[in-house]
Amino acid sequence: KDNEALQKEISAFIGQEAMHTHEHVGFNASAQKYGHDVAKYERQTGVVIQTARKLFAKVVKPFGMTQEMVDLTATTALEHFTATIASQLLVNHHIQELMTDSTMSTMWFWHAVEENEHKAVAYDVYEAVFGKGVKAYALRSSALIFAMTLIFIAPSSFVFNLLKEDKKLN
């Protein structure tokens, strides 16, 4: 609370997350129009997130970690990972050429820039709480491995189901 610049970054982050939620609602409504059961995927995502939170909290509890610390660590890891993917969207012309819908490409470019900003804010908060030492690095690295596993498993399942729904699964 003593760092005014960080507090401003956090406030901007919260505002961007509200906008992010608004965009997801619009995206989900569009997907719903095409017959996708968005509510089902949201429920499944919620179960995965809550299960992962509890599991990771149990693993790191012996090291004095609270649920809030776990949540911050997970946020930092996930923001880093999504920003890494987002940066590819911003620089990879092949990916950009695949996006033929101008409304969707505009939304994804905005999202990519936002994710890069979020990574910086999440890391700044993480560093303010945990510092820069070996323990902070080890925690951040283990959370990233955990997050990458979840990010691989959950979306892969969703893509499989979406392809199945679209009858494009061979």
Where are these regions (language model features)?
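Non-heme di-metal
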Residues: K1-N170
